[in-house]
Amino acid sequence: MADERKDEAKAPHWTSAPLTEASAHSHPPEIKDQGGAGEGLVRSANGFPYREDEEGAFGEHGSQGTYSNTKENGINGELTSADRETAEEVSARIVQVVTAEAVAVLKGEQEKEAQHKDQTAALPLAAEETANLPPSPPPSPASEQTVTVEEDLLTASKMEFHDQQELTPSTAEPSDQKEKESEKQSKPGEDLKHAALVSQPETTKTYPDKKDMQGTEEEKAPLALFGHTLVASLEDMKQKTEPSLVVPGIDLPKEPPTPKEQKDWFIEMPTEAKKDEWGLVAPISPGPLTPMREKDVFDDIPKWEGKQFDSPMPSPFQGGSFTLPLDVMKNEIVTETSPFAPAFLQPDDKKSLQQTSGPATAKDSFKIEEPHEAKPDKMAEAPPSEAMTLPKDAHIPVVEEHVMGKVLEEEKEAINQETVQQRDTFTPSGQEPILTEKETELKLEEKTTISDKEAVPKESKPPKPADEEIGIIQTSTEHTFSEQKDQEPTTDMLKQDSFPVSLEQAVTDSAMTSKTLEKAMTEPSALIEKSSIQELFEMRVDDKDKIEGVGAATSAELDMPFYEDKSGMSKYFETSALKEEATKSIEPGSDYYELSDTRESVHESIDTMSPMHKNGDKEFQTGKESQPSPPAQEAGYSTLAQSYPSDLPEEPSSPQERMFTIDPKVYGEKRDLHSKNKDDLTLSRSLGLGGRSAIEQRSMSINLPMSCLDSIALGFNFGRGHDLSPLASDILTNTSGSMDEGDDYLPATTPALEKAPCFPVESKEEEQIEKVKATGEESTQAEISCESPFLAKDFYKNGTVMAPDLPEMLDLAGTRSRLASVSADAEVARRKSVPSETVVEDSRTGLPPVTDENHVIVKTDSQLEDLGYCVFNKYTVPLPSPVQDSENLSGESGTFYEGTDDKVRRDLATDLSLIEVKLAAAGRVKDEFSVDKEASAHISGDKSGLSKEFDQEKKANDRLDTVLEKSEEHADSKEHAKKTEEAGDEIETFGLGVTYEQALAKDLSIPTDASSEKAEKGLSSVPEIAEVEPSKKVEQGLDFAVQGQLDVKISDFGQMASGLNIDDRRATELKLEATQDMTPSSKAPQEADAFMGVESGHMKEGTKVSETEVKEKVAKPDLVHQEAVDKEESYESSGEHESLTMESLKADEGKKETSPESSLIQDEIAVKLSVEIPCPPAVSEADLATDERADVQMEFIQGPKEESKETPDISITPSDVAEPLHETIVSEPAEIQSEEEEIEAQGEYDKLLFRSDTLQITDLGVSGAREEFVETCPSEHKGVIESVVTIEDDFITVVQTTTDEGESGSHSVRFAALEQPEVERRPSPHDEEEFEVEEAAEAQAEPKDGSPEAPASPEREEVALSEYKTETYDDYKDETTIDDSIMDADSLWVDTQDDDRSIMTEQLETIPKEEKAEKEARRSSLEKHRKEKPFKTGRGRISTPERKVAKKEPSTVSRDEVRRKKAVYKKAELAKKTEVQAHSPSRKFILKPAIKYTRPTHLSCVKRKTTAAGGESALAPSVFKQAKDKVSDGVTKSPEKRSSLPRPSSILPPRRGVSGDRDENSFSLNSSISSSARRTTRSEPIRRAGKSGTSTPTTPGSTAITPGTPPSYSSRTPGTPGTPSYPRTPHTPGTPKSAILVPSEKKVAIIRTPPKSPATPKQLRLINQPLPDLKNVKSKIGSTDNIKYQPKGGQVQIVTKKIDLSHVTSKCGSLKNIRHRPGGGRVKIESVKLDFKEKAQAKVGSLDNAHHVPGGGNVKIDSQKLNFREHAKARVDHGAEIITQSPGRSSVASPRRLSNVSSSGSINLLESPQLATLAEDVTAALAKQGL
């Protein structure tokens, strides 16, 4: 298995390169072939323009394509519950529903397919096979049903067998083995021969079909599009078959290798299933084609399949799939295999031709194949009962034998003909391998387990099969998919028998397998992730051999539950059936884990990008290496999504079809959900949430439902807008609460609407996508999209799970995983498919492996943890339907498929439409976001925009969770769309919880692929580059990544503008792209600068993502804790990544400083981020993550704006606006305006100063927003991760204050950069976190106290009244949580001395002394700006466009929080507002101290930047040096203080555990970010302290308290102390860098010394707090001592002795009694002894008697008596006694003796036969009993 895994990994590697080739060349033809010839995928871009043929398939299967969508609707309608339950559950439900519908449709569709079959007759082989088909009419229906059933079974089997395949690639064939072996067992020679022969003919046919398909496909595909690749693949396949024959010649000397190769394919198909998912571009890249074919097949199949299989087939399909498909599908497959293999070969020929001829031929071929399917489906209709009879593997082997005999004869004829045909067809490629495959298949089936298992090692043995397997896996992966699917349907023989069907279904099933894999990947992403997929996969690869039989039986049995769940399966496929599988985890593992493993396979494929699987990692690297592999992944995930849809609805035949269609959206989201689930599983696994099994199950229960429920609840509520967090709680909340919210903004009817719109859209959008993909631009994006987006996204969720999202799999963990997980992930997947997805995908592939593996592990663990079973019950909403609903509802039909940008638009259109729906539901949140974005983008400072934001705020408050989650989801989606387009694709994922993994992968991959993604972004934004180009050219000196990001931003902005809502989309996309661009820029600078941050950032990001996902997964169970974890994760993913991004962006900022236009762009980005931020507040984690990212980027933008625009007014304005918006949300707009003006005046006064001010403002605003959120989720806030992202000029300071008391997992991300002075702004990430934690502790502690009352006031007051707020925040936090206490502790160093002080008092004291002049100047500047930019508007609405832009972000973010927190904050905060307004000068002063502090914070950021910010190389080096100098002072001083302080109070242990571990795990980036975050919490209070301290001794006193926190903080994040020390240590102590350094100087003295002393007090406090706990524990230990004394008391011992004595006595007595009991009486004690003697000797005697009696003259009764006694003389002696006794007590004393004696004596009458029998029986019984 390890070899197999390695081979899987190998296969991915070579599959990555050669398979990429094959994917690009060989497999696109094979994709068509796999796509069922009719997948009709043009493969324009990446062989991905599957839409044409796919649509042709859809058109041809117009009803089916629509039916797929309709089915998705119907199934999704059913699955609405199902998908809510789980991807797998949905998958199973879809399998059942689709099977039921397919069964229902099958009857009508079979007739259609009969007609189609008549069409199919056009195919010579199909005709011949159809001709062969009649000889086996049952098989013909079985074949038809094999096509359908096999399709369904392949869908189900893909789900199962792909699960199994992926779980047990061997098992797929070992299933055949097992079936064949079962047949062997049943018919050891003949049946095995039949099984092997049928299997062999089938295998031969399958393999010839496979090979022939590979030969035909590869030959014809070579003819068609990739002749050499296909030929190479075919030759490789032959090589693998033949060399495999040589290499794997274990028991399969020459032929076994081919089966081994086939097994390798099966195994490697599992591997390839993975590969197919990601690495095997054939089923994956062809996956779109294959899904086309599969979709068409599935269209055919679902129609009859859903109907005919409704009861019988779902089970046969899943469980009955093994059952019915084995029988029916054996017959069917044998029959169908004959027609199908010829049909497929003919389609192969046709496909080759059609590949040449194009989609039309593929469509025709598909149609032909589909008619073949239809015929077999019709024919299979008869067998369904048989299939139903075959629900169990026992039946399967028997029926398989029966069918094998039947099919063997018929299929031998057909297969022989077909094999001859195939051999003739395949002879050029490998006729001998066909025979070898036949023979080998016989041997293989005999030795399938060995062969498969050996083949797995052998597959790993012959690396050349890597090349060979590239083609082989491509073809064979198709076929293996088909085979595995067929095997799943036909278990083994069906797999092989069905392999001709497998060939066609290799095309179809490859598509379907891709679909199923996608489904299975999506579902198994859940299931697999639930199941320890790697464990299961490896085990299952081995176990699959075992489990395949068991899995066939289990699959039959489980599939019977699946079947039972047919209708229930829609709900319980994962839930009930999967729970059954969970119960049958091991057995069902085959089936269930087939789903799981299919998903794992897919997931591993996707987790190739998301190293959810080892092979996933390997393959992930491989897939990462080759874009076609990501296309394979993408296609695989698309295929998975489609394979999954095959089970569900075959929404898009091709992955992109379903990906880009509503189906694609739904499935993209579903896939994202699955990938998120995968990611969640991965995350859970990373968390080690009970290992893969536990986590996978848990993920199935929780995380998978996260994604599923994301889609489910989203689709149910609003697929995209309200992507449910993969969190079980979130899903429950979202499903129940958020779903209600979603219903608020997305009515339950919307799913149908979304769904219904989806179907036409699917064809339209598929066509559009095809066209878009055909478009050159789209070629890049669409191709990448096909490959990378789904796979990467899938990996990220779904992780995957997956990600999947993270890779699609995670990103179940944060709000993004919750809200944006599906939406963001699906859209990331889609958008990945749109923009630069290969790069993103590859970067994901490259970077996520760490993250993804964690994701994979976490997700699988999380899913297992969730068990995927319970959660599925929770989430009954169909995953596809919700996502499809949300996506369809978003009017994605036209928009999403318009092109690459259109795809992004579609995603954004989906998002925007979803957002519009959300806006409809959420009021004008998105419109306001758009207005805000527009205002930001236009920097037209519309007061109305802010007013809208306030309206939005109100609406957000009304729809805080609903709308903002949706908006956040949309922001995520848009973010994802943009990030998909941009390198920031995954960073945007960071923006949301779900996107964490993706964002991590993105962040991880972006630094690697930042340039390429930027290049791709440039491509995607090329049309729009002109917009950015002036500033970019101006900035060209600046970081190219920033340029590329700005390009993408503006281009995406333009694209978005050209999208549905030009402004909405632009704003959204600008927001998203701002995030993405900033992130890519950040990454590019990181990459360029090669800062520690890049590596550390990547590692941290990966670790963080894993930890984040782990947190998410772990925290997901309860929404509150989930929220806290999500927020932490969001902070970590978003905050730390954002810190990374912000640092990079800051570096970019420094570069961008020169270009005002860049600043404008960044303002737009800030606006985007502002808009982005508005979404997040609903989702605490996504809110904070997005907020953090948006704010960080916004700050970053503002920083560059402020720097670049030397007119601080403009650059200040965006920051100001964004931050005041937060404050506005937190408090009243007037206050925001005042502060904004204050900040802006400060900005005018000093850009850097203003920046610090803005940072502080941002800190305050973000803190206010966070407070809002905290207030919104006061309970959550405890467990909340307060992430203060402060972007200073050089640094992004993310202060994560994790109050792990975390009643809720809310993650508050504050962006301090907006509200902090520029100097402070650099520290803003840290300072902001510090502000967030400390101002949150100080300013927000009070606002949190009064947070419900006046959210904005805390922010304002935070800036103006840092200590006062600290007090309030302390109070609030004390009230709220230990986090508040930590905030108190954080603020205690400020508040301890100034607890009762109002912020005014301390700040006035602090500010005047510290930076009185500076603050006065700044105050004048800020007041200028306030006056210039209406102070009222600043508070109420900022009229300045940029300010508006800046405001919008906070406003949106704050809006949620305002709604939540206003009640709490409003009154207190209004008072504080008054104070803040009254003390806006003080705030300026605070900002100035913040500036002073900000420098250190900025230095902290610099350190972080070293960690994460590679962009600010020019600024960073000096700052870094300074930072290092300061780090020396401050790292030991401030960082430790900060690190220890915030977390120790309440966050410290949890936060430390989460953040600290995450920081350490995340490496320096995480450490820097976490440290910065934690320090920033201290840094901001220290800033306040610094301000106060510099100004007043009181502040130093507070600062003294403050440093206390950092040491504790440092203890939390030991590695991060340096960063806080930067903030504490001025950037340039004596070098005032435009007032940034000057304040930093002041901060230095104040911060350095006070933080040390404060750190100790804080640490002491924190330590004291734990120590009292420890003392309490000691008291408990005292109790333990008492316990010890109690035992010493001897009572326990006495009791124990007594008990022991009693027990011993009782036992002895019991033994004696037992003796007497056997004796049957006191008198019979001797008899008992005799019994002993009898037993002892009677055994021998019995044995003797047994031997002798049987042989000892049975005829001679007397002789027997004599002989008996003589033989058992010793016994006869006893026997004499016994006989003597036995007459009286014979029955009692020695029944054995009595029997013998009776036999001997009284039973003498019984003549020798009976006597001998009795003697034998007695002796046997005596021997048994006696022995």
UniProtKB/Swiss-Prot annotation:
Modification Phosphoserine occurs at: 136, 140, 143, 285, 498, 601, 605, 610, 629, 725, 729, 736, 738, 821, 881, 890, 936, 1133-1134, 1139, 1155, 1159, 1347, 1353, 1534, 1555, 1588, 1653, 1679, 1782, 1787, 1790, 1795, 1808
GO terms for MF: calmodulin binding; dystroglycan binding; microtubule binding; structural molecule activity; tau protein binding
Coiled-coil annotated spans: none
Residues modified to Phosphotyrosine: 745
Sequence segments annotated as region (Calmodulin-binding): 1447-1467
UniProt entry tagged with the keyword Acyltransferase: no
Any one GO cellular component localisation term in the record: dendritic growth cone
One protein family per Pfam: Tubulin-binding
Keyword annotations from UniProtKB, A to Z: Calmodulin-binding, Cell projection, Cytoplasm, Cytoskeleton, Microtubule, Phosphoprotein, Repeat
PTM summary: Phosphorylated at serine residues in K-X-G-S motifs by MAP/microtubule affinity-regulating kinase (MARK1 or MARK2), causing detachment from microtubules, and their disassembly. The interaction with KNDC1 enhances MAP2 threonine phosphorylation.
Tau/MAP repeats: 1661-1691, 1692-1722, 1723-1754
Main location per the UniProt record: cytoplasm
Record's compositionally biased regions (Basic residues): 1426-1435
Any one Gene Ontology BP term: negative regulation of microtubule polymerization
Residue numbers bearing the Phosphothreonine modification: 733, 1154, 1602, 1605, 1616, 1619, 1649
Biased composition (Low complexity): 120-133, 1541-1552, 1562-1574, 1587-1603
Ranges of biased composition (kind: Polar residues): 63-73, 416-430, 1609-1619
Subcellular location, record wording: Cytoplasm, Cytoskeleton; Cell projection, Dendrite
Functional description taken from the UniProt entry: The exact function of MAP2 is unknown but MAPs may stabilize the microtubules against depolymerization. They also seem to have a stiffening effect on microtubules.
Subunit structure: Interacts with KNDC1 (via KIND2); the interaction enhances MAP2 phosphorylation and localizes KNDC1 to dendrites. Interacts with DPYSL5.
Protein name stated in the entry: Microtubule-associated protein 2
Taxonomic lineage from the root: Eukaryota, Metazoa, Chordata, Craniata, Vertebrata
